Amino acid sequence: MTTRFSPGALPVFLFLVFFLLVAGPLRAETYTVDAFGDSITAGWVVYARDGNGCVGCGGYEPALQSLLKSAGREAVVKNWGKGGETTDHGASRVDIVIALDKPRYMLLMEGTNDLLFFSEDTVLKNMTRMVDASLARGVAPILGTILPDSRGGKRITQTNDLLRELAAKKNIPLADHYTAVKDNWSSLTADGLHPNSAGYAKMAEVWFDAMKTIDLTPILMLLLDE
């Protein structure tokens, strides 16, 4: 099936391109991006603390903030990572965080701690709860795959396959951290599980690339028919 412009759509499309490239930066709206997850989001081992909605406090959050600023986006990235958290605990607090911040984007990445005690199906169930909670409040969720664990982590590949399927099913962006870092993980990790500074910078790039897939899609889909 060939995708084409609807009749009369081209002038509107050209106007929107002009608006986004010229007028958009002049009328930039500040919005919030919530980084939500476990100790990897919080910033351990590089920053040994939990996030509580803080800004510039650790993990990939400061690097992502810099990428957004360089791209001319008026965004504030807040760190809501909590060390040792399982997906069940994450799902129990995600509504509270969304209500507090009213973010535009929710960056969701958890599951590593679950695999010490629970099944990959438990991760899927609870990550689905987090995605649905975001969508129900009009927040754009982006789902992250979990990182390698060179200390002997098990079922990571199977879990990430389920997360990829979830993102496809919900039609939301996937930040595939595992694929991005697995070949060079030894140089990107501090302890085999948590990233080092270079690893967190790489994570920020993966999140940023996933965020870019959202911005124009709703506008363009209104202009195109199949």
What is the predicted function of each stretch?
Residues 11-23:
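Bacterial N-terminal signal peptides
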Residues 28-79, 95-102:
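Serine-esterase "nucleophile elbow" of acetyl-processing enzymes
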Residues 29-32, 71-76, 101-107, 135-142, ...:
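Loop/turn elements at helix/coil->beta-strand transitions in domains of secreted/extracellular proteins
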Residues 35, 42-48, 82, 87-124, ...:
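Oxyanion-hole/transition-state-stabilizing segment in secreted/luminal serine hydrolases
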Residues 46, 52, 115, 148-219:
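Catalytic His-Asp segment of secreted/periplasmic serine-dependent ester chemistry enzymes
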Residues 58-65, 88-100, 121-130, 157-161:
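Alpha-helical scaffolding within the catalytic cores
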Residues 109-113, 130-160:
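Active-site segments of SGNH/GDSL-like serine hydrolases
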